[in-house]
Amino acid sequence: MINIRKTHPLMKIVNNAFIDLPXPSNISSWWNFGSLLGICLILQILTGLFLAMHYTSDTMTAFSSVAHICRDVNYGWIIRYMHANGASMFFICLFMHVGRGLYYGSYTFLETWNVGVILLFATMATAFMGYVLPWGQMSFWGATVITNLLSAIPYIGTDLVEWIWGGFSVDKATLTRFFAFHFILPFVIAALAMVHLLFLHETGSNNPTGISSDADKIPFHPYYTIKDILGAMLLILTLTLLVLFTPDLLGDPDNYTPANPLNTPPHIKPEWYFLFAYAILRSIPNKLGGVLALVLSILILMLVPFLHTSKQRSMMFRPISQCMFWILVADLLTLTWIGGQPVENPYMIIGQLASIMYFLIILVMMPVASTIENNLLKW
């Protein structure tokens, strides 16, 4: 009898994606982050669902409903902090996953890469709206500042902002719709993740060498299932340590003050995973210019496949490109640091230089480095 997993209409889909899938024999731990992102998403949807059972999306009660979850609901505090810190773990995995794609040339799978960039945008939008829900000071002012950026769009800007707000300022209507969107978007992300996998399985995985691995494939199960379980255990361990020992390490103390439209916090800043983009936004004195730079800082990822000038796919055997990549990583860390600092010298000038460097590395230095390497190899 033929195995049921290969014949059953539903089970054969799972089988072809997670069991009998032929995978390269040499993919490293950098290939674990895809499955970790899946785990993060499931965890966020589950914890979010339980939070939504007790949360109220009204300006008068939102803050106290979160306090109620932490104080009165059975294990509410752990659910709340797993959700908040789970978002941080999600973004750590996302940045690692994108970095892996950049380093090993996985962006040459065009459809997979572009769906991935859309996933990144969707996740950032979801996280932003989630940050508004506790209705603390940073929630309110973060929402005000970021939604206000849309007013920089010529002609329709002001109308667009008021349409998103549902009034003339961030208020009850804004909070209610943000809750609605924050609830629905993770399911959109889950659907997009399936499309992402669908496109990936059309081509098969890349590997560290960037060379075709068709001649040497191994089944996904048991080799990569056991490897993914190890990654998952490390992820859950890290998250548990964060939640149980320092749950507020990555949060902002200002968000423990209820939202007050009459009192602006001294330093308005988003969560740590948006600081690099926030630094790029602030480094341009012009409002529209800043908004464009902010969007382009992520959208530029879609250009990367067209800027690939090397005759090799991966950076594994390209030392000059490796240097460029790690300079880019250092630059992003610098931008993250600057995004959390006040707008004054020397931070302003450092932020401006780091922003210029960011675009310069991706648009100019990396393609030039690749061309130099091609010439060194006499290709």
Curated annotation (Swiss-Prot):
<dbReference type="GO" id="GO:0008121">
    <property type="term" value="F:ubiquinol-cytochrome-c reductase activity"/>
</dbReference>
<feature type="transmembrane region" description="Helical">
    <location>
        <begin position="288"/>
        <end position="308"/>
    </location>
</feature>
<dbReference type="GO" id="GO:0006122">
    <property type="term" value="P:mitochondrial electron transport, ubiquinol to cytochrome c"/>
</dbReference>
<feature type="transmembrane region" description="Helical">
    <location>
        <begin position="178"/>
        <end position="198"/>
    </location>
</feature>
<keyword id="KW-0408">Iron</keyword>
<keyword id="KW-0472">Membrane</keyword>
<feature type="transmembrane region" description="Helical">
    <location>
        <begin position="320"/>
        <end position="340"/>
    </location>
</feature>
<dbReference type="InterPro" id="IPR027387">
    <property type="entry name" value="Cytb/b6-like_sf"/>
</dbReference>
<feature type="transmembrane region" description="Helical">
    <location>
        <begin position="347"/>
        <end position="367"/>
    </location>
</feature>
<keyword id="KW-0812">Transmembrane</keyword>
<comment type="subunit">
    <text>The cytochrome bc1 complex contains 11 subunits: 3 respiratory subunits (MT-CYB, CYC1 and UQCRFS1), 2 core proteins (UQCRC1 and UQCRC2) and 6 low-molecular weight proteins (UQCRH/QCR6, UQCRB/QCR7, UQCRQ/QCR8, UQCR10/QCR9, UQCR11/QCR10 and a cleavage product of UQCRFS1). This cytochrome bc1 complex then forms a dimer.</text>
</comment>
<feature type="transmembrane region" description="Helical">
    <location>
        <begin position="33"/>
        <end position="53"/>
    </location>
</feature>
<dbReference type="GO" id="GO:0045275">
    <property type="term" value="C:respiratory chain complex III"/>
</dbReference>
<comment type="function">
    <text>Component of the ubiquinol-cytochrome c reductase complex (complex III or cytochrome b-c1 complex) that is part of the mitochondrial respiratory chain. The b-c1 complex mediates electron transfer from ubiquinol to cytochrome c. Contributes to the generation of a proton gradient across the mitochondrial membrane that is then used for ATP synthesis.</text>
</comment>
<feature type="binding site" description="axial binding residue">
    <location>
        <position position="182"/>
    </location>
    <ligand>
        <name>heme b b562</name>
    </ligand>
</feature>
<feature type="binding site" description="axial binding residue">
    <location>
        <position position="83"/>
    </location>
    <ligand>
        <name>heme b b562</name>
    </ligand>
</feature>
<dbReference type="InterPro" id="IPR005797">
    <property type="entry name" value="Cyt_b/b6_N"/>
</dbReference>
<keyword id="KW-1133">Transmembrane helix</keyword>
<dbReference type="GO" id="GO:0046872">
    <property type="term" value="F:metal ion binding"/>
</dbReference>
<feature type="transmembrane region" description="Helical">
    <location>
        <begin position="77"/>
        <end position="98"/>
    </location>
</feature>
<comment type="similarity">
    <text>Belongs to the cytochrome b family.</text>
</comment>
<dbReference type="InterPro" id="IPR048259">
    <property type="entry name" value="Cytochrome_b_N_euk/bac"/>
</dbReference>
<keyword id="KW-0496">Mitochondrion</keyword>
<feature type="binding site">
    <location>
        <position position="201"/>
    </location>
    <ligand>
        <name>a ubiquinone</name>
    </ligand>
</feature>
<dbReference type="InterPro" id="IPR030689">
    <property type="entry name" value="Cytochrome_b"/>
</dbReference>
<keyword id="KW-0349">Heme</keyword>
<dbReference type="Pfam" id="PF00033">
    <property type="entry name" value="Cytochrome_B"/>
</dbReference>
<feature type="transmembrane region" description="Helical">
    <location>
        <begin position="113"/>
        <end position="133"/>
    </location>
</feature>
<keyword id="KW-0479">Metal-binding</keyword>
<dbReference type="InterPro" id="IPR048260">
    <property type="entry name" value="Cytochrome_b_C_euk/bac"/>
</dbReference>
<feature type="binding site" description="axial binding residue">
    <location>
        <position position="97"/>
    </location>
    <ligand>
        <name>heme b b566</name>
    </ligand>
</feature>
<keyword id="KW-0999">Mitochondrion inner membrane</keyword>
<dbReference type="InterPro" id="IPR016174">
    <property type="entry name" value="Di-haem_cyt_TM"/>
</dbReference>
<feature type="binding site" description="axial binding residue">
    <location>
        <position position="196"/>
    </location>
    <ligand>
        <name>heme b b566</name>
    </ligand>
</feature>
<protein>
    <recommendedName>
        <fullName>Cytochrome b</fullName>
    </recommendedName>
</protein>
<dbReference type="InterPro" id="IPR005798">
    <property type="entry name" value="Cyt_b/b6_C"/>
</dbReference>
<dbReference type="Pfam" id="PF00032">
    <property type="entry name" value="Cytochrom_B_C"/>
</dbReference>
<keyword id="KW-0249">Electron transport</keyword>
<dbReference type="InterPro" id="IPR036150">
    <property type="entry name" value="Cyt_b/b6_C_sf"/>
</dbReference>
<keyword id="KW-0813">Transport</keyword>
<keyword id="KW-0679">Respiratory chain</keyword>
<feature type="transmembrane region" description="Helical">
    <location>
        <begin position="226"/>
        <end position="246"/>
    </location>
</feature>
